[in-house]
């Protein structure tokens, strides 16, 4: 049927409405629907956020234990006390190791207008880079500890567990990104760890200085990760706001 010349405006509006509805359907279908179970409703997206937050809580505990172990185990305690003493004296090298974390280069905003106006997709991508920033350094620390002499199993096992949980958390975040933003392009950019050369050096002093940096940074960042996850869960699922 040929439409009269007086109808183009109406047909154009109808086409726009159809396209708009298709886009809304595509967005809704990208997010896992609630699945019925005997016990109630199960939402894969919410459950993945819960899994991520549980992993982040585990990381919090492991980071605490690792930090304490390094200060109390004979393998490292003496040198760590010296590092703290040098930190008070403002030794430049030790101060850098004790206060600077390379992961802050990808740290999401957590206060003020910048935080309130942050786009959720960008916020999620930034968190992926933030979480992933320590996976490479942890991998190298595990390798070095395996070849160092007299390394206690308690220290080695803690680093392994932290690395494993970091990878698990990163996979959860990647899954969330692909489900909520299926067409998003993600460029993972993990900043270089400047203390890697210290870790790879021959002297135990420098290896422990690298671990001094790693333990301080991971100890502090685990607090922030839980906050960021709660923010994202609220923004994306509307739960626990």
Curated annotation (Swiss-Prot):
GO terms for molecular function: hormone activity. InterPro entries: 4_helix_cytokine-like_core, Somatotropin/Prolactin. It comes from the Eukaryota. The keyword Signal applies. Residues 1-30 form the signal peptide. Keywords: Disulfide bond, Glycoprotein, Hormone, Secreted, Signal. Detected only in placenta. Localized to spongiotrophoblasts and trophoblast giant cells of the placenta. Gene3D superfamilies: 1.20.1250.10. GO terms for cellular component: extracellular region. It is found in: Secreted. Coiled coil: none annotated. Disulfide bonds join 34-41, 101-217, 234-241. Glycans are attached at residues 213, 220. Belongs to the somatotropin/prolactin family. This is Prolactin-8A9. The lineage of its organism: Eukaryota, Metazoa, Chordata, Craniata, Vertebrata. The gene is Prl8a9.
């Amino acid at each position: 049927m040929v439409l009269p010349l007086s109808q183009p405006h109406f047909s154009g509006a109808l086409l726009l409405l159809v396209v708009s509805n298709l886009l809304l359907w595509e967005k809704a279908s990208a997010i896992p629907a609630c699945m019925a179970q005997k016990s109630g409703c199960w939402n894969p997206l919410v459950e993945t956020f819960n899994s991520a937050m549980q992993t982040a809580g585990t990381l919090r505990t492991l980071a605490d234990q690792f930090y304490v172990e390094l200060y109390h185990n004979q393998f490292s305690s003496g040198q760590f006390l010296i590092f703290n003493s040098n930190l008070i004296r403002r030794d430049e090298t030790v101060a850098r190791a004790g206060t600077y974390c390379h992961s802050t280069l990808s740290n999401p905003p957590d206060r003020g207008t910048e935080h309130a106006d942050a786009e959720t997709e960008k916020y999620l991508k930034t968190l992926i880079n933030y979480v992933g920033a320590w996976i490479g350094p942890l991998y190298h620390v595990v390798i070095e500890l395996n070849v160092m002499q007299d390394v206690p199993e308690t220290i080695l096992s803690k680093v392994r567990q932290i690395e494993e949980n970091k990878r698990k958390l990163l996979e959860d975040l990647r899954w969330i990104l692909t489900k909520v933003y299926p067409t998003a392009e993600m460029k993972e950019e993990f900043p270089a760890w400047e203390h890697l050369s210290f870790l790879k050096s021959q002297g135990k002093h420098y290896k422990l200085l690298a671990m001094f940096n790693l333990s301080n940074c991971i100890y502090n960042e685990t607090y922030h990760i839980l906050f960021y996850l709660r923010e994202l869960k609220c923004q994306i699922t509307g739960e626990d706001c």
